């Protein structure tokens, strides 16, 4: 791995994730399990560690116990040469209050910046699914001479109204930063595409510190990185865009190169899982040259008995399928599917139990959900709406530990 001692990583992991309820009823959004073996935060941490950035502070707040534990247990570094990945809860250094926004989270944690004294700071979000080599973005930032560089992903202009949008000139300088505009701007080379902000930033340290301090004195500010800090630096002529399509990740296939998903809603979370299950997946979990690291448990291998069958599915360790059928689904560890049961197009998190003859379709079942014998989920949505959360796209979501 490449060592970058002059770079400090700050991961913003305090998100509440209300639109992912009930998956966020008992945990922070970055701690939500994903992909059968990971949590959402594992993607950004894997990208940073794979790039050689080994001084990382993860700023946490909302229901952070499971997230703090996951970071402490899964992401231990040796401590050699000052390497660390450490969760940092709200420290209330500026009075008895929690973070009021992502910029305020950094303000309250500036002691970490002063202690490390980095030349550059990468500030990344913790709840997106993607692969990226951050070092390439840092090098682009250094060469551009900008105070801040914002990662932008090209999305069709007709869909860009749902994102923070970047209007840039041909040199890459950002001239406007627009939050969910009705009429998104095109890119300099393609009027039909728009740069959407990925929520990933590289700052020259002094620029970030000065901007954070100035924002803290603005009583009209929401103290948000994307809503306040970046627009202020755009207005000051300090901001440039980094085109995500230029980021080349080792081992990436033509099919999954440039993949990035905001999984902030139940439908988006579900769709991102369905991206994993095909023979040639849109997002490939099996890239050994740029691995996604997750929690490792001492579990037995998955087991299929009495004709148990899984097709186009991801099946985690410790799962047992007994005379059951699973199709187009993602099963996390220790899931048991009993005889005659059918699971189709679903996401089952660790410890889920599916009883004999049960049917589960287009559903997300959180940890330790138990579906009784003969139960049917995802077939009659009107009935399901009386019992569970059902997304706009018709995905049934059942919270942790529910017995049905």
Swiss-Prot record:
SUPFAM superfamilies: Nucleotide-diphospho-sugar transferases, Trimeric LpxA-like enzymes. It comes from the Bacteria. Alpha-D-glucose 1-phosphate binds at residues 99, 164, 179-180, 197. It is an enzyme of class 2 (transferase). Involved in the biosynthesis of ADP-glucose, a building block required for the elongation reactions to produce glycogen. Catalyzes the reaction between ATP and alpha-D-glucose 1-phosphate (G1P) to produce pyrophosphate and ADP-Glc. Homotetramer. Belongs to the bacterial/plant glucose-1-phosphate adenylyltransferase family. This is Glucose-1-phosphate adenylyltransferase.
